[in-house]
């Protein structure tokens, strides 16, 4: 089960990275999204698990206010949930 989730997360990150300007047409939004995705890319070596520290980490990568980061994170979470439902139901990542 953990391997499946790790596989899904890798595919999710790849999908969002490849389509970042389609999902987030504004340059600043795309940069914020990429910094969030970077945390997913580094998840195996990250030692930060609380929300406050994650937000701080993102703000260090991109100069953005918390509400803007939350807005981008919410959009990514929505995509994650939609794609994960399909992945669980059909066993593959739908692009």
Located regions from the model:
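Transcription-machinery-associated regions
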Residues: 1-95
């Amino acid at each position: 089960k953990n391997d499946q989730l790790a596989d899904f997360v890798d595919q999710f990150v790849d999908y969002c990275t490849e389509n970042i300007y389609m999902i987030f047409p504004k340059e600043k939004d795309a940069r914020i999204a990429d910094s969030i995705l970077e945390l997913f890319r580094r998840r195996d070596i990250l030692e930060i698990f609380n929300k406050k520290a994650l937000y701080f980490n993102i703000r260090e990568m991109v100069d953005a206010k918390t509400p803007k980061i939350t807005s981008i994170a919410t959009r990514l979470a929505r995509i994650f949930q939609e794609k994960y439902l399909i992945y669980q139901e059909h066993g593959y990542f739908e692009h």
